[in-house]
Regions:
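Generic, ordered loop/turn and secondary-structure boundary motif
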Residues: 14, 18, 25, 55, ...
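Flexible, active-site-adjacent loop/turn segments at secondary-structure boundaries
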Residues: 11, 15, 24, 34, ...
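Short, surface-exposed linear segments at secondary-structure transitions and domain or protein termini
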Residues: 47-50, 96-97, 233-241
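Secondary-structure boundary elements
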Residues: 93-171, 179-181, 247, 258-275
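Short capping/connector residues at structural and topological boundaries
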Residues: 18, 22, 31, 68, ...
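Intrinsically disordered, low-complexity N-terminal segments that are enriched in acidic
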Residues: 1-95
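Residues in well-ordered beta-strands of folded domains
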Residues: 25-27, 42-44, 75, 216, ...
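Hydrophobic/aromatic-rich core segments of domains that either
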Residues: 20, 143, 175-263
Length: 275
């Protein structure tokens, strides 16, 4: 399947931004499940391209003159290949392939402030410890989290910790992924966060979509995906942008600035099947 993606982000400010740096992770990862045919990042001035510590393509945009708005646009076409049969739950990122030898999966056993557990979440995780080292056990864990934490439509607010999200009980796909990752790491299983998009039969008629997120866990010498929001439903295609220890490592755009006053952000993403 060929997916055409257009992603536009507009930041506006009620006072001039004196200087800013934006860290942009809007270039899809290339692997056995997805291959870039065309891709472009448009920024007010040329951004520096590099790779971060997780292997994501990273564009760094630095503006050192006053501005009242910042526009960032990513667009292109990606060829995707869907999983087959019993491999349905395997990830678009690295599924069926050994881990990148330069980055051990053990890196993803370390808890972050966003993926730390409290007593309540630790108790919940321990209830699934018996079979957590198996794919079936992790699927049971993912299902239990999804049942306890149904998605609240439209909830894409500030990033909160896994423990806070678990206590709230009904939040975003980001929070579901963080809780799953926190449980995995607490039980000794490497797990990581994935940001990206999802195309499905229920996508809006105008092609507008929201960003998507899921988790991956390391079992049997490969990464397996766990999309708690959709359970990898049929008629879908997942497109991975970036991976990281949590959302803060893998979010599409993250920045710092001096000045600017109140910031307003408008994001619009459109995805369609290309011929």
């Amino acid at each position: 399947m060929k997916l055409a993606i257009q992603h536009a982000t507009l930041y506006t400010y009620d006072a001039p931004v004196r200087s800013s740096t934006q860290y942009i992770r809007l270039t899809p990862r290339e692997n056995s499940r997805q291959r870039i045919l065309e891709w472009r990042i448009d920024t007010p001035i040329p951004a520096t391209q590099t790779r971060d510590g997780y292997g994501n393509v990273l564009h760094v945009l630095t503006l050192d003159k006053p501005v009242s708005e910042i526009r960032i646009r990513a667009h292109g076409i990606v060829q995707t290949r869907a999983p087959d049969g019993e491999n349905e739950s395997l990830s678009p990122s690295d599924a069926g392939f050994p881990a990148n030898s330069s980055l051990s999966p053990l890196v993803f056993r370390r808890a972050t402030p966003v993926t730390s557990v409290d007593k309540a979440l630790a108790k919940f995780a321990h209830g699934h410890r018996k079979h957590v080292g198996t794919l079936a056990g992790l699927r049971d864990l993912a299902s239990a989290i999804a049942d306890r934490m149904p998605i609240k439509p439209g909830d894409t607010g500030a990033t909160i910790s896994a423990a806070e999200a678990f206590a709230e009980g009904a939040l975003s796909v980001r929070d579901q992924a963080h809780v799953f990752i926190a449980c995995c790491r607490h039980l000794g299983v490497p797990a990581r966060f994935v940001s990206g998009y999802m195309h499905s039969a229920i996508v809006s008629t105008d092609g507008l979509i929201a960003g998507h997120a899921w988790a991956e866990a390391w079992v049997g010498d490969q990464w397996h995906s766990f999309d708690l929001a959709t359970n990898w439903a049929k008629n879908r295609a997942h497109l991975a942008l970036a991976v990281g220890a949590d959302y803060l490592d893998a979010c599409p755009i993250r920045g710092v600035r001096i000045g600017g006053g109140i910031e307003t952000m408008l994001v619009q993403a459109r995805l369609s099947v290309s011929q």
